[in-house]
Amino acid sequence: MSQNGAPGMQEESLQGSWVELHFSNNGNGGSVPASVSIYNGDMEKILLDAQHESGRSSSKSSHCDSPPRSQTPQDTNRASETDTHSIGEKNSSQSEEDDIERRKEVESILKKNSDWIWDWSSRPENIPPKEFLFKHPKRTATLSMRNTSVMKKGGIFSAEFLKVFLPSLLLSHLLAIGLGIYIGRRLTTSTSTF
């Protein structure tokens, strides 16, 4: 809550999270907020209470479907220290019911977190079905002159290679020349008839 120039006057309602500070002259020429002093321990209590109230209201109004953040042992130690610290500094307006309710909330959050972590860690892995596993086909022996016994023995200029290669070369050339002559005659006769 904000305080006006007089320390005893307090505003009853805060608009959002804004706090209005009024400055007073302390005699040294500098201005210091009236609500801030070294001996003012009430401010710390007010801030702690506001933090606890805001935590409770935000956790109740949250409708998010995602699981809450998992707490580490350090977080649980901090939560228990905060609870014991806040018990010692309770105002008369807070009752034992609020304290019990807060402890139940913390325990339920811890239980939910551990259940969620256990469910997540024990789920089956996403392995595709066996029919979708792609396998490379086995490589068949390619037809190549390099892998023949003729090439392994003597190379290109061996007698065995030349006996096979030269007749096939001559035959393919004769076929190509014959096909070329045939197509050429067909084209010349078709153009002369028009």
From Swiss-Prot:
GO biological process, one term: defense response to virus
Keyword terms, alphabetized: Apoptosis, Host-virus interaction, Membrane, Mitochondrion, Mitochondrion outer membrane, Phosphoprotein, Transmembrane, Transmembrane helix
Gene Ontology annotations for the cellular component aspect, listed alphabetically: cytoplasm; dendrite; endoplasmic reticulum; endoplasmic reticulum membrane; mitochondrial membrane; mitochondrial outer membrane; mitochondrion; nuclear envelope
InterPro entries to which the protein is assigned, alphabetical: BNIP3 (IPR010548)
GO molecular function: endoplasmic reticulum-autophagosome adaptor activity; GTPase binding; identical protein binding; mitochondrion autophagosome adaptor activity; protein homodimerization activity
Sequence motif BH3, location on chain: 100-125
Organism superkingdom: Eukaryota
Region (Disordered): 1-102
Places the protein is found: Mitochondrion; Mitochondrion outer membrane
Biased composition annotated in UniProt, kind: Basic and acidic residues: 42-55, 78-88
Membrane topology summary: Single-pass membrane protein
Residues with Phosphoserine modification: 54, 66, 86, 92, 95
Bias-annotated ranges (Low complexity): 56-69
Membrane-crossing segments per the record: 164-184
Protein family membership: Belongs to the NIP3 family.
Subunit structure as annotated in this protein's UniProt entry: Homodimer. Binds to BCL2. Interacts with BNIP3L and ACAA2. Interacts (via BH3 domain) with SPATA18 (via coiled-coil domains). Interacts with BOK; promotes BOK oligomerization. Interacts with PPTC7; this interaction promotes BNIP3 degradation. (Microbial infection) Interacts with adenovirus E1B 19 kDa protein.
Known function: Apoptosis-inducing protein that can overcome BCL2 suppression. May play a role in repartitioning calcium between the two major intracellular calcium stores in association with BCL2. Involved in mitochondrial quality control via its interaction with SPATA18/MIEAP: in response to mitochondrial damage, participates in mitochondrial protein catabolic process (also named MALM) leading to the degradation of damaged proteins inside mitochondria.
Name of the protein: BCL2/adenovirus E1B 19 kDa protein-interacting protein 3
Protein encoded by which gene: BNIP3
